[in-house]
Structures are given as structure tokens and as C-alpha cells.
Amino acid sequence: MASTSQPHVAVVGGDTLLARELREVLEAESPAPRIHLIAATTDNATVLSADDEDVAVMTPLTAESLEGNSVTFLAGSPASSRRTLKLAPSTPLIDLTASLDEQPEARLRAPSAEPANTRRAKATV
């Protein structure tokens, strides 16, 4: 039986269109993860972002805001991606912007080009 605990993920650059699309995909998962939105800046203020559908609260980009997440998605600027790597070098990062692809420790993946037997299979209920 699969665990139903809610995973915790962070999204740096939480106010971008890419982050919004990522949130839609993640919220459709079961169980949906708890999503922690992080602004691409290090300002000490909490940022409120409003669009047509919802209001999002984003915390500043700090080492503390990156703690306790299973994974951090990078959806902001190249500068915010580099700052995230510096602040939390041991945190698993998924760079959706390819800002860190030249880092020596980066693991590049192209799921659509991988053999079918290495892709994650969808669970059926």
C-alpha cells in the first residue's frame, strides 16, 4: 500500500508563469504536495502575488525557506537559481529553467529520450 503522506516541495520563482503551470500539475497529483512558494529575491518581506484566480504568499529566498522540503523546483531567474544552489547545496533541485545545467554536479535528464522501461510507471488504483 502506498504512503498517503503529503510531500513538501518548494518552488523558487513562485510568481512566474512557469511556477503557476507547475503548481497546476503538482496539485493534480495524488496526494497533492504541500507547495511552498519562494520569491526569487532575498528581500526580507513576504510577497503577496495575486492573479485572476488566486492569491499566493511567497517567502523570501533564504536558507531557512529552503529547509524541510523534499525537493526544490527552480522556476525563477538564473540569478535566483544560483543563489538557491549556494544557500542549499545538499537540497535536491529540479531546474526547470536550465540555469544550472553547466554545473559540474548537475545531472541532466531528457525523459522523452530515455528508453520506455526507465520511465516512472503510473500507478493504477
Where are these regions (language model features)?
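N-terminal Rossmann-like NAD(P) cofactor-binding subdomain of oxidoreductases
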Residues: 1-125
